[in-house]
């Protein structure tokens, strides 16, 4: 058995949800209704996020990148946490419903690209199109977009100890199959609604301290 950590990006590794930041800055007002339908689960994540990015003109690509470089902040303790998992031979993956054009640049030099799973984007037309290379497998039929529970099944064995770190509705299906969940923000609400045990966190120092205790118990 090995310990596998599966970590969300937007609102988890970063302090803010970058997709929502992009929408607030660059999308027209109708994006708000789509966002609310995603959170209420009236729209699947795949449908909703596709609709959101179809509201953004592709000629804003450079402006969006510059905006995120200037505003995105990595959550406190993340760099030290990555060093901690390396030192303890813990497998670490970023499984993000975010987009390649901002996830890769913001994690460059911190996480190897082969440990990052995210969505792809096409800027060749008038509006941004999202591609979904990590869709649901046969065990999930809810149109996640990037299916985190499917990736967990793909990247690990059933007897591994699965840790999920997340903050929102997009992390719920992964949390359902995790052995331990670190949650903040809206994921806490969804965990409580679904009777999923979780440990709340605000910084990666919190996560590291709890994981250190877990390693001592399992030693």
From Swiss-Prot:
GO terms for cellular component: cytoplasm. It catalyses: 2-hydroxy-5-methylsulfanyl-3-oxopent-1-enyl phosphate + H2O = 1,2-dihydroxy-5-(methylsulfanyl)pent-1-en-3-one + phosphate. One of its GO terms (molecular function) is 5'-nucleotidase activity. The keyword Amino-acid biosynthesis applies. Pfam families: HAD. One of its GO terms (biological process) is L-methionine salvage from methylthioadenosine. Pathway: Amino-acid biosynthesis; L-methionine biosynthesis via salvage pathway; L-methionine from S-methyl-5-thio-alpha-D-ribose 1-phosphate: step 4/6. It is an enzyme of class 3 (hydrolase). Dephosphorylates 2-hydroxy-3-keto-5-methylthiopentenyl-1-phosphate (HK-MTPenyl-1-P) yielding 1,2-dihydroxy-3-keto-5-methylthiopentene (DHK-MTPene). This is 2-hydroxy-3-keto-5-methylthiopentenyl-1-phosphate phosphatase. It comes from Bacillus cereus (strain ATCC 14579 / DSM 31 / CCUG 7414 / JCM 2152 / NBRC 15305 / NCIMB 9373 / NCTC 2599 / NRRL B-3711). The gene is mtnX.
């Amino acid at each position: 058995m090995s310990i596998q950590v599966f970590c969300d990006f937007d609102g988890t590794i970063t302090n803010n949800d970058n997709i929502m930041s992009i929408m607030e800055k660059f999308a027209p007002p109708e994006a708000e209704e789509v966002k609310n339908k995603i959170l209420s689960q009236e729209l699947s994540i795949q449908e909703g996020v596709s609709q959101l990015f179809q509201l953004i003109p592709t000629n804003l690509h450079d402006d969006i990148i510059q905006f995120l470089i200037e505003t995105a902040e990595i959550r406190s303790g993340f760099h030290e946490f990555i060093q901690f998992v390396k030192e303890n031979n813990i497998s670490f993956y970023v499984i993000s419903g975010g987009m390649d054009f901002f996830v890769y640049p913001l994690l460059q030099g911190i996480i190897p690209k082969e440990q990052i799973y995210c969505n792809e984007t096409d800027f060749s037309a008038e509006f941004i199109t999202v591609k979904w290379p990590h869709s649901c497998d046969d065990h999930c039929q809810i149109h996640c977009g990037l299916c985190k529970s499917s990736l967990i099944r793909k990247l690990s064995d059933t007897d591994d100890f699965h840790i999920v770190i997340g903050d929102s509705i997009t992390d719920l299906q992964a949390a359902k199959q995790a052995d331990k969940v670190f949650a903040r923000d809206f994921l806490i609400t969804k965990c409580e609604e679904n009777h999923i045990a979780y440990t709340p966190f605000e910084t990666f120092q919190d996560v590291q301290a709890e994981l250190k205790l877990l390693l001592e118990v399992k030693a």
